[in-house]
Each structure stands twice: as C-alpha cells, then as structure tokens.
C-alpha cells in the first residue's frame, strides 16, 4: 500500500538537515543513514548517501531518476547465491 497523499513523504529530519547543509556549503560528503524508509527528495540529487543494509553501509549516488523512491530500494539486504541447478563436473 502506498502512503496517503495528504500525509506527504517521510524524510528523516536529521538526514534532511545534513543534505540541506551540504547544499548551502557546497561540500560533497558521504552521509551515513539507517533510515531506509526515507523518500528521496530533489535536494538529494548529486549527493552520495550510505544506506545501511543490516550488515554494512552501501553507498548510493542519487540521480534524478531516483527522486520519489525510497533509499532502501537501492541497498539490497539479501545476497543472491543463485538457484540450485545441475553441478557441472
């Protein structure tokens, strides 16, 4: 289910403050966050956000196509080892 439009997007307050401060100062620093549920806003474009996947931080460079998606979509939590198949001898 998607979030109600009258509520607006969820963005972690501390994460948003850090990105806005970087926009004002012009610095490009990797920001670590555990907030996978935060929506990517247009202010995030051009910055790198390190998103926690439960084990380590995955660096995510934000582009214009990512606006409106959530940060957790770009940091997979499970490793795909492949399907069971015929083992070649």
UniProtKB/Swiss-Prot annotation:
Family as reported in the entry's similarity comment: Belongs to the universal ribosomal protein uS19 family.
Assigned keywords, A-Z: Ribonucleoprotein, Ribosomal protein, RNA-binding, rRNA-binding
InterPro entries reported for this sequence: Ribosomal_uS19, Ribosomal_uS19_bac-type, Ribosomal_uS19_CS, Ribosomal_uS19_SF
Name of the protein in its database record: Small ribosomal subunit protein uS19
Its biological purpose: Protein S19 forms a complex with S13 that binds strongly to the 16S ribosomal RNA.
GO molecular function: rRNA binding; structural constituent of ribosome
GO biological process: ribosomal small subunit assembly; translation
Lineage, broadest ranks: Bacteria, Pseudomonadati, Bacteroidota, Bacteroidia, Bacteroidales
GO cellular component, one term: cytoplasm
Any Pfam family hit: Ribosomal_S19
């Amino acid at each position: 289910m998607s979030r109600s439009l009258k509520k607006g997007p969820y963005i972690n307050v501390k994460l948003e403050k850090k990105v806005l401060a970087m926009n004002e100062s012009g610095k490009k620093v990797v920001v670590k966050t555990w907030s996978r549920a935060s929506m990517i806003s247009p202010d995030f474009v051009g910055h790198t956000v390190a998103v926690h996947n439960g084990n380590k931080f995955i660096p995510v460079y934000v582009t214009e196509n990512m606006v409106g998606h959530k940060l957790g979509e770009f940091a997979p939590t499970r490793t795909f080892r492949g399907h069971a198949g015929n083992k070649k001898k």
